[in-house]
């Protein structure tokens, strides 16, 4: 990968994106190129440039200095583009099969040029359409296990880990998560967004001191536990997938945090899809949760036993303690994400796309009950089968 620092920042347009691709030598001179801006997120411009003869393409992603969902009144650091390209490169050193190739990045322009993944589909969209993606959970379990282990104090020299962690200090993007996932939904905050019919349910959460105490504990973990290099935003909209291939994208929220956070985000987004499904249709989603954890625990444990650099690694009970805390935290983090995606800023199409309003409100009330109990009762979970139990208990 090439990283450079060139001109002063300016947002790209489609013609400028094409000119950049040609200047970088990614296409031959005179090649007929098609370009379109395909970004559907809140923070970036994304250009898809394709050779109209060979159909080969590249993606040019540029960070915006503000959140599109809010506008220029919400400024954002452009450093997140560097965080993203560095995270993709770091992840590629451990799991190259699960991330796009990075061809070029420019710090000043906040640009990353990467592999075209248009042969794949965004997992959220496919899951909403009813696709099941049999290998998705196996791949994500391995992705999280290997990136977590190899960037932890167990998998790398502790001093080298501290140096790596310094390069992923990401306060601006972490602040978004601190606010939108762990704080705002639990209080009457202007960023919250929900239907008027949900107000009694939401106000009950705002008055729930028991819930607030447990959410505060989870927020503290997010703020203070620098265990592993996290993707930081591992939802189903950050994953490209097919029947046999998985690619994790958009790690601009990457930072050193608690080992269970990425797992919790992924679990939550599977649950959000399950909330929009019939009982029979939910089963593959619960199976994905089971498989993700099983693969994560198996791969992480094998690496621990064969490659750990920690002197205490052979101490009986330590691995089990690490995995137990990771699982409990993942359950709680999942609860925060379920609530946030239901009543906070930046909803998900899994719920908002439910066509009939009455059914949508039923699903969202279910989401709030489920999220609350995931947070409060996380310590009583003994395995992923408890997701099924709690899901059924909170369905009314």
UniProtKB/Swiss-Prot annotation:
Assembly and interaction partners: Homodimer.
UniProt xrefs under SUPFAM superfamilies: Protein kinase-like (PK-like) (SSF56112)
Protein role: Catalyzes the phosphorylation of methylthioribose into methylthioribose-1-phosphate.
EC number per UniProt: 2.7.1.100
Positions contributing to ATP binding: 44, 61, 115-117, 250-252
Chain sites annotated for binding substrate: 233, 340
Superkingdom of the source species: Bacteria
GO biological process, one term: L-methionine salvage from methylthioadenosine
Homology family: Belongs to the methylthioribose kinase family.
Gene3D superfamilies: 3.90.1200.10, Phosphorylase Kinase, domain 1
Organism phylogeny: Bacteria, Bacillati, Bacillota, Bacilli, Bacillales
Residues forming coiled coils: none
UniProt-listed HAMAP family: Salvage_MtnK
Pathway: Amino-acid biosynthesis; L-methionine biosynthesis via salvage pathway; S-methyl-5-thio-alpha-D-ribose 1-phosphate from S-methyl-5'-thioadenosine (hydrolase route): step 2/2
Organism: Geobacillus kaustophilus (strain HTA426)
GO molecular function terms listed in the Swiss-Prot or TrEMBL record: ATP binding; S-methyl-5-thioribose kinase activity
Keywords: Amino-acid biosynthesis, ATP-binding, Kinase, Methionine biosynthesis, Nucleotide-binding, Transferase
Stated name of the protein: Methylthioribose kinase
This protein's encoding gene: mtnK
């Amino acid at each position: 990968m090439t990283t450079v620092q060139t001109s002063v920042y300016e947002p790209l347009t489609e013609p400028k994106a094409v000119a950049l691709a040609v200047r970088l030598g990614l296409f031959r001179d005179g090649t007929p190129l098609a370009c379109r801006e395909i970004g559907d997120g809140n923070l970036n411009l994304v250009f898809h440039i394709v050779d109209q003869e060979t159909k080969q393409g590249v993606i040019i992603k540029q960070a915006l200095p503000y959140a599109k969902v809010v506008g220029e009144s919400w400024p954002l650091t452009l450093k997140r583009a560097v965080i993203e390209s560095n995270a993709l490169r770091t992840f590629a050193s451990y799991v190259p099969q699960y991330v796009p190739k990075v061809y070029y990045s420019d710090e000043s322009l906040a640009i990353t040029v990467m592999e075209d993944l248009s042969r794949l589909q965004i997992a959220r969209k496919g899951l909403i359409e009813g696709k099941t993606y049999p290998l998705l959970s196996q791949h994500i379990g391995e992705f999280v296990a290997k990136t977590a282990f190899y960037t932890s104090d167990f998998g790398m020299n502790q001093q080298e880990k501290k140096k790596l962690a310094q390069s992923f200090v990401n306060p601006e993007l972490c602040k978004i998560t601190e606010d939108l996932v762990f704080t705002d939904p639990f209080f009457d905050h202007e960023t919250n967004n929900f239907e008027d019919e949900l107000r009694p349910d939401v106000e009950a959460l705002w008055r729930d001191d028991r819930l607030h105490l447990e959410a505060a504990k989870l927020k503290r973990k997010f703020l203070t536990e620098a265990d592993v290099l996290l993707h930081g935003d591992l939802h189903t909209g950050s994953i490209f997938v097919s029947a046999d291939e998985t690619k994790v994208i958009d790690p601009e929220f990457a930072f050193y945090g608690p080992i269970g956070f990425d797992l919790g985000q992924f679990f939550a987004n599977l649950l959000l899809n399950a909330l929009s499904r019939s009982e029979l249709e939910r089963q593959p989603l619960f199976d994905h949760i089971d498989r993700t954890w099983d693969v994560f625990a198996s791969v992480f444990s094998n690496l621990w036993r064969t490659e750990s650099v920690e002197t205490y690694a052979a101490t009986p009970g330590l691995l089990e303690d690490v995995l137990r805390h990771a699982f409990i935290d993942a359950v709680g983090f999942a609860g925060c994400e379920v609530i946030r995606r239901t009543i906070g800023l930046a909803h998900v199409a899994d719920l908002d796309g439910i066509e009939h309003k009455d059914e949508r409100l039923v699903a969202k009330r279910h989401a709030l009950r489920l999220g609350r109990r995931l947070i409060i009762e996380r310590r009583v979970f003994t395995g992923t089968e408890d997701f099924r139990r709690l899901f059924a208990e909170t369905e009314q």
